[in-house]
């Protein structure tokens, strides 16, 4: 089983041309927009998993927020103020088809969760949000993400599924 040599921010000179996760929209984003969003527009940062100098996966993160009413836990909702709450968004996540199923996506997400704890400690963060594609739903659920409040019913087939993982859950898991 290959282990990632490192997970690090995307570099301006990284070769992304040989990467394919099997999802044309994710491949197109990684090849054409990840660098622009990071280096020119400053919208997001993409982290790459590297094995033997080859990029085998990526996760793009951005600052985000979640409305209190959408936080899935009623207990947590009661403790939070009524304004938009700071969160970290997993905007994109892809693993090269040649190494899928070997834990690289989980390693990338674990890196993102550690970033969320860092964000909590530096500027505030109540959790991680993502819009999971239907085919990625079980991946995120297996890592503890739950649907945000108000989207359990009526999602059209194929629409992304908004999910949330609370910072306390993240911190406990990372300390374990």
Regions found by a protein language model. Name each.
Residues 101-115:
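Conserved acetyl-CoA-binding loop-helix of GNAT-fold acetyltransferases
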Residues 1-40:
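Short amphipathic alpha-helix that is part of the acyltransferase structural core
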Residues 58-92, 155-158:
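Conserved acyl-donor/pantetheine-binding loop and adjacent beta-alpha core of acyl/acetyltransferases
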Residues 46-51, 90, 127-132:
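Extended hydrophobic secondary-structure segments that form protein cores and membrane-embedded regions
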Residues 91-101:
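A short, internal acetyl-CoA/4′-phosphopantetheine-binding micro-motif in the GNAT/acyltransferase core
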Residues 124-135, 149-176:
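C-terminal "cap" of GNAT-fold acetyltransferases
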Residues 42-63:
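Conserved beta-hairpin
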Residues 130, 140, 145:
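Conserved active-site tyrosine of GNAT-family acetyltransferases
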């Amino acid at each position: 089983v290959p282990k990632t040599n490192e997970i690090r921010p995307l570099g301006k000179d990284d070769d992304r041309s040989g990467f394919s996760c099997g999802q044309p929209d994710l491949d197109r984003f990684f090849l054409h927009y990840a660098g622009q969003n990071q280096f020119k527009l400053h919208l997001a940062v993409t982290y790459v998993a590297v094995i033997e100098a080859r990029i085998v996966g990526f996760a793009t993160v951005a600052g985000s927020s979640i409305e209190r009413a959408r936080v899935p836990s009623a207990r947590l909702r009661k403790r939070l103020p009524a304004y938009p709450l700071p969160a970290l968004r997993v905007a994109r996540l892809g693993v090269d088809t040649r190494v899928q199923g070997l834990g690289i996506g989980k390693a990338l997400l674990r890196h993102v969760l550690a970033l969320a704890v860092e964000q909590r400690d530096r500027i505030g963060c109540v959790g991680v949000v993502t819009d999971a594609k239907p085919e990625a739903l079980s991946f995120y659920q297996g890592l503890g993400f739950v649907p945000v409040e108000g989207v359990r019913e009526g999602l059209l087939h194929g629409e992304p599924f908004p999910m949330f993982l609370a910072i306390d859950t993240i911190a406990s898991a990372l300390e374990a």
